Amino acid sequence: MNLDEWIDLGISNGVVSVPEIEEKTFEEIYRQWFLMKINVIKAQSCDRIEVTYNRYYAGSWFVKQNVSMLDEAAVIRFLTGVIVGWGNITSKEFSRIYQIANNVLVYARFLQLGGVRLFDWEMIRRYVPEGKLVKDPHKDFAVPRADIERLLRMVVEQDIYPVKRSACLCLVMNFYLGLRVGELASLTWQDVDLEDRVIRICKTETKAYRRDENGERCGAMVYAVVEDVKTVYSVREIPLLPEAVYILEKLREHHDRCGYKNQYLAYDGRDTVRVRSLDRTLRKLCRYCDVKYFSTHVIRKTFATMLHGSGMPTRYISDLMGHSDMVTTERNYILSYRDNYNALLGYMHKGLDFRLRGGETDESAGDT
């Protein structure tokens, strides 16, 4: 007897049972998985998952398939179709697309649905054309020292943008702190300890949709300050340099002069969404100061880049940034300068120290 005949014999004698195939589509399992995720991950992470699903999965042939009928070939076909069909998919975006397929099918297996196979995800990654993924076309550069000094002078001393003085002072102070914009927006005077010369980071401003019991959005996006941070490593204390203390003193003088009772450092007389207000303020501030525009996140990256250039160990930089590992810091936060010719030339002179004399190197000139 061959294997098939043995199996048929086992089935007919009741020794081998055939699992009942359950007719559940990928879309149905995704909904169950998404409802489960709402209770275990942050709301803004759920929003990102939903956006990715709606863009690449919703309405596709893939989500209409019964999960019991899906195999590696189907997953490869779908993911390849996304990469090739959409074009210009970055590695970061693809990781979000892949995460949904992987997590939903693993979840279906966890539910012990009849007929759902155990997928070989390593094989799937091998056959998906990840070589066609593109690098992020936008490249950040560190803010030049001259631009930073110009911004500091025009904000702190000249009050270039008086209507948004609090926001402007917070933005330029962040060159000494390296905070995420949500952390900067949520800073209050209770977080500032001028006696010990530290700022304590333990909360952030978030944005996310409220959802009902079915996982559907309820109303507009909600902005809120939460006693939480991105990761457990983000709870930290940042030492204050004398320059940062000076800016804080200027900020306190401004709040006292205006009679502000609000505790937020970036408060400018109106209860606005502070993250959005800081973003808009920076755009105008760059224009008023005649410097090339950069984002609030580039301030954070410039902070890390300048500390790295000073010789600070990456472990310490990661601690100040609130990163869980040094790889994140080194891979994503150490930038180049747009105009770095002289710096590169200096390092090349120092490192490539073999010289020519009349067409010969120093070493060969001494050979006999």
Label for each model-derived stretch:
Residues 191-198, 293, 312-334:
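Short, polar N-cap/turn motifs at the start of nucleic acid-interacting alpha helices
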Residues 104, 145-149, 239-291:
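Active-site/catalytic core of tyrosine-dependent DNA strand-transfer enzymes
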Residues 196, 209, 216-235, 327, ...:
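C-terminal secondary-structure termini that scaffold catalytic or DNA-interacting sites
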Residues 142, 205-207, 321-347:
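Catalytic-site neighborhood detector that most strongly recognizes the C-terminal catalytic loop/helix
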Residues 68, 128-154, 210-241, 259-260:
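DNA breakage-rejoining catalytic core of tyrosine-based enzymes
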Residues 70, 165-168, 271-276, 292-310, ...:
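Short basic/aromatic active-site micro-motif
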Residues 91, 95-99, 110, 116-181, ...:
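Basic, Lys/Arg- and aromatic-enriched nucleic-acid-binding interface segment
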